[in-house]
Amino acid sequence: MWKFKPILKTTIWGGDRIAPCKGIQTDLDLVGESWELSGVEGDVSVVADGPEQGMTLTDLLSKYGAAILGERNYKKFGTRFPLLIKFIDARQDLSVQVHPDDEMAQRQGQANGKTEMWYVVDAAPGAKLANGFREAVDPADYERLVETGDIEKVLNFCDIKPGDVYFIPAGRVHAIGAGAFVAEIQQTSDATYRIYDYHRKDANGNERQLHTALAKEAINFNDTEGTAVKYVPRNDIPVNVAKCPFFTTNLMIVDEEVMRDYNELDSFVVIIVTEGDGTLLCGADAVSAVPTEMKVKQGDTVLVSASANGLSIVPGDKGLKLIETYVG
């Protein structure tokens, strides 16, 4: 099991909740994102401690290969980690945007597109997210809606609260609203087409670039299915909230020790702690000849190798809430 150093990103819309959530110190202002686990070129995660401390995620995959990723994932992705895990803190509204699917991204010279999901960690009063359209939009009206700033009028805005889950397939127009603090799970891609940005200016006084034409090509104009994922929380039992070709995600509320069996799972597992603290226990596997134990707390993200047969999750006195995600 590994933890990685967070890659903190300052943004014009960023806030001040990420560092307290993770229990870390930073001199940075307006931290909008923490990249928790990343194989994106130029922003590759680095192991925080343990025998491989200082090793990049790419080097770790070069060393252990399928023992970490799983046989199927290693054949498909090699040393390119297939998921990007983030925390996002929005002090202001993020831009209205869309991501391409794999086919379009590859036409643009990128490895893949971006399907993603959000888990709401915290939400200020009145916080909202936009996910898809309220009703189908005529593509012929798209550029007019962007030019007049009326694009927001056709979006499906949802009031949010902690624990809400939203799935965002490639091609769905979306936006994170002011006051939202989310954990994001996505394909490894930084392909984002900005549609509308409230005429905000960067540090040099320039409005940020829009990608109106590319976005039009990427958008599914008939996508009106952006409501929150419906699920019933259950104690000590994983609850599935997302399953797609790119990732499967479960939520867990752990009040008593839980044993997760990964014998039939040909994939790494990522654990994201959203509340509480506890201990993860993993038996000996192809990566570690001895059992390993790791203390975890709110804001931690842990990578568990595919060669692990299972994971024992022991909650602290106040319990533990976590996200479990993998490819498969």
Language-model segments: what does each one mean?
Residues 85-86, 94, 116-119, 157-158, ...:
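His/acidic/aromatic-lined binding-pocket segments of jelly-roll/cupin-type domains
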